[in-house]
Amino acid sequence: MKVNFTETVLRDANQSLIATRMPYEDFEAILPELDKAGYYSLECWGGATFDSCLRYLNEDPWERLRKIRKACPNTKLQMLLRGQNLLGYKHYPDDVVRLFVRKSVENGIDIIRIFDALNDLRNIETAVDETIKCGAHASGTICYTTSPIHNIESYIKLAKDLESMGVQSVCIKDMAGIMDPQTAYDLVRGIKENISLPVIVHTHSTTGLGPVTLQKAVEAGADVIDTAISCFSNGTSQPPTETM
């Protein structure tokens, strides 16, 4: 079985370890090497990158995306989108969501990972629909947590609902790094048995379990795992790409 890698160094690793403060010129020189590495995708935009470019780095986030696209012609570029919240901190109207998605794709994004923090799929419907209409890959997301009502069965139902919505892949997003290895195995296996889409697993090394959690996810059939190049890995970031 082939396992693919999404490299997070330009987005989530950058965001998790240094609050998304890495300016474009700090990573410009390495972009051609990242492009040749053979990643499934390069997560490079969305999340807090948009806000940080404007608020702290004095950069145009759209221009950053265009530069990355030009430097990485052979690798799919990926972004993280907060559903109806886009890259902001409030809900936006449907027409704004559709225009933002359209412009993201036009400026170079290939894959949009779309989530709602409370797994309310009504808040991602518009973004998913527009992503598909634009010819990009809509990756529907399940935000992982633990509680009396959050269990394997509830997440399998969410995965089925995402498949019915038309997404092209399902991502299990363990943003707090609290998913243990056995749960990762059971969850990935359960979802793979109930849907026909690729399953992606995203975690953090916050608790130190990240590498083993991803290993068990792969054993259960995960198609893609998120990792970060070693110098930007571990801690609150992703497990190291080289180790995995």
Task: Give the positions of each predicted feature.
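Short catalytic helix/loop segments, enriched in acidic residues and glycine
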Residues: 23-34
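N-terminal amphipathic alpha-helix/helix-capping segment at the start of soluble metabolic enzymes
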Residues: 1-18, 65, 70
